[in-house]
Every structure is written in C-alpha cells, then in structure tokens.
Amino acid sequence: MLNSRELLLSKYVNTIKKDDNSFRLFHSIHGGLCEVDNEIYKVLNYLKKSRLLTDIYNEFSYIDNSEINDIVNEFFEKGFIIYNGQNEIESYREHEKRRINRIETGEQIKAIQLVVSNKCNYNCKYCFTNSIYSSKEREIYQKHDKNQIMTPENAINYIEKVIEKIIKANNKELSIQFFGGEPLTNWNTIERVLDHYKNEDRLKIDYSIVTNGALITPKISEYLKKYNVPVIMSFDSPNRSHRYTNDGSDSIKNTIKSLEILKENNNYIAFNSVLSRDTFDYFNNDIVDFAQNYNVSEIGILLDLNPSFYKDFNLDDIVNKVIDLYEYGLDNGIIVTGYWHITYQNIIMNKSIDRGYKTCSATGGQLSIEPMGVVFACKGSSGYFGNMNDLEGLLSCENYIKYASRSFINSNNCINCELIGHCSGLCLGAIEKKYGNIMYMDKGACDLYKLLIRRLIEREKNIFRYDIDESK
C-alpha cells in the first residue's frame, strides 16, 4: 500500500534539535518520543511535501532502498508519516465521539476518590478548601452535618456500586484513594474497606492514601503496609512550613515522628509538595535530602492551582526550580514527578491516545464520593454529578458527561498545541473558580507546561534513537 500512495510528514510532528546529528521528535497526538540521526531527519523532512516512495528512493539514492522502506514503515506505524489527504484531527475527533458514546457505561471510571472524612487536624495556610470552590453544591455539602464522616457501611456500599458497574464495562482495574479533610480522622472506615476487599477477585484494586501523616501510628503503618497502600504525605520543605496544626503550632515535628514510624515498617512513602507563591522562596533540593533520610521513594511536585502564579512569576524561574529538583532527585535515587511529568511520560509512549485519561484522573476519570454519597469530579473541584443512590442517573447526567469527556477533549484553542494529546491543562478546580468553564485554556499555565516539557525532552539521557546504519 505504501508503494502506491503519496506520503506526507504529519504536521503534528515536533522537532527539537539536539546537535547537528541528533534530532528529537514527538507527535502531538500519538507521542512516540525518539531521536534520529541527520540522514533519517532529512528523509522525514523531505516528506513535508507529499511524495511517492519512489521519489524518496530517487532523492536518497545513496541509501539502500530496503533501509528507506524500514524508515518509512517504522514512522508510518508511529503516525509520524501519513497518507496525503489524511485528516488526522478528524480521526482524533471520531475517536472522541466513540468514547463519548460509551461514557454512560461507566467505562471512563478508573478511580474512586473516597472522601472518608471532611474533618482535619491541620489549618494549612493555602488549603484549597478555603479558596477554590465555586458551586452552590460545594457550599451546601462541604460543612453539612451529615457530610463529615463516612460510615464503613456506606463506604463499602459506594464501592460495590462502582465495581458492579465498571466490570460490566469490562474494566479490569480500579484505584481507590482515601482522601479528606484528613482521612486518618476516620481510620475505622479505611480499615473496614481494606479488610472487606482483601480477597477481591472481580478486578484488581490499587489503593493509596493522601494524608498529612500526623495521626499515623505503628498499627496504622503496619495495616497500610499489609495492604500495599502507598502513603502520600503532604509536605513541602524541611526548612519552613505553611502547614499548621489547629492550635497554631508548626507541623514539622509531627511529620518527622510519622516518617520514623513509616520508615521502621518499610512503607512506600511519597511526598505531595506544593510549588506556589507561598513556598517558592524556600522550595529547593533540601526536600530530596530530607526524603532520603526517611526512605521516601517519590516526590510529587504540585504546581500552584492559582492561575495568577503563572503571570506573576517568571516562567523560566519556575521551570528551572522544577528541573533542578527533578535532576537532583534522579541523581539521588528519588523519583520526582507530578502531573506535568505525566504529560512527558505520555509523550514517550506510542499511540498514547487510547489511555483512560491524560494526566489527572480527576479530569474525567474518577468519582469523588463524599461521606453522604454526593459525588463531585474531585475534592479540589466544584463539578457536581449527583448521588450514589442513583449511579445510573449520575452517569447519564449532562454534567458528568461533560466532565468525563474532558479526559480526552481539550479546549478548541488547544488544536494546534504540541501537547494536545498528552496534557489536560490546569487543574479543573482552578479553571472553574477563575473562568467558570472547564474547557478554558489558561495561557500562562499552558506556556509553562510547554516550556517545561521541552526542557525535559532536551535534557533526557535515555531516548530511543534511530540511526541509518542500524536500519538495515
């Protein structure tokens, strides 16, 4: 087939020149990050105008035809080379339509954020519950007397309803994240859920818990270890804190005490660390050294949810801070990640269009279930879907379909963006609050993501490389 049709380099192929014989390429929709030598780059560049395969043979007569065939076939399979006249964005839109038509089946549910408690023992300066909400439903339910603590019976009931629905949609896995408030203010429910599903064989369940860590005890640590529950602790820096207990004292002593317990039991520990206007001045590599001391495996950098951060701070300064910490972590055996890094991982993949969601499960891939059964997109979102008492109605409601579609549909302003197939943009809660429209593209945040991803690509040391001599 390739012999008889005109071929063309996709307009969605992006090039970053490394040196005179190294070019890094990725596709805005399909990913497939790779490096090519100058000869392969010239072959691909020649296809910026439509050509027959015989045209390529003639233009590059010094390269064996079999090698050219290998090159063309390889990059055709990756989606980098297309047929002349092929409408890639139309194919992308058709893929979106097919997924929208399946949303009501529950297929899009990849995760449950189980808000077991809306109580918290801390009073953090920049907690999003104090600033990000923007819907009447959030105003009603956040402090509702019956929406503070989830009973074990309700938790299991909610999970059962989701499992029964998604296995009919042929989903094989479900992530359950215990969330709050502070989830450990309701340890009883967490313990009951873990025990109830210890022999679950209908699908694979992965757990995690997001906690400030202050209430961790040896028993809790052992239980979380027993059920392979990663402990994601909210922690920004060993030098200074904006996280305070309700009596106004700094939280660092509590953090250290909990980390010592978790280290003793060899729990998997990750930090959620916020890089924001509040933490910018003291956010540095010290957190990696601190993490090493307590066997913390991973640091997730959460970028500021407030869009003004990307206007008020120099983007190069933000990117440099992230890259410095990322590379320092690599050098010291600590994984440094974040939603920004998931975008990068998506670009490394081939044909990544088929995954469940792009970066954050909250952007179309999860149900955030509150204690009394009301459901939102995320604890950090005001997007309200309904109640677990009517899961079928919830999945067919206009708002759920709109949010679930957001996992694979971006703003129309993203059409020509190099990250369109890999990035979900700024946090939904921030977009809701600032713009009142989850399809809005915040330019400041987008400019930061593009700059950060390009820096990661430029500095990556382990990229698959194609050389003309190795294509025989």
From Swiss-Prot:
Q: What class of enzyme is it?
A: lyase
The EC number(s) given in the record are 4.1.-.-
Kindly list the positions annotated as binding [4Fe-4S] cluster 1: C120, C124, C127
- Cysteine disulfide links: none
| Chemical reaction(s) catalysed | L-isoleucyl-[protein] + AH2 + 2 S-adenosyl-L-methionine = methylcyclopropylglycine-[protein] + 2 5'-deoxyadenosine + 2 L-methionine + A + 2 H(+)
User: Corresponding gene?
Assistant: tigE
| Cofactor(s) named in the record | [4Fe-4S] cluster
Which organism is this entry from? Paramaledivibacter caminithermalis (strain DSM 15212 / CIP 107654 / DViRD3)
Q: Where does [4Fe-4S] cluster 2 bind?
A: C414, C417, C423, C446
Task: Give the protein's recorded name.
Answer: Radical SAM cyclopropyl synthase TigE
* Family assignment from sequence similarity: Belongs to the radical SAM superfamily.
Q: Where is the Radical SAM core domain?
A: 106-331
Q: Which InterPro entries match?
A: Aldolase_TIM, rSAM, Sulphatase_maturase_rSAM
Q: Where is this site: May act as a redox switch?
A: Y339
User: Highest taxon of the source?
Assistant: Bacteria
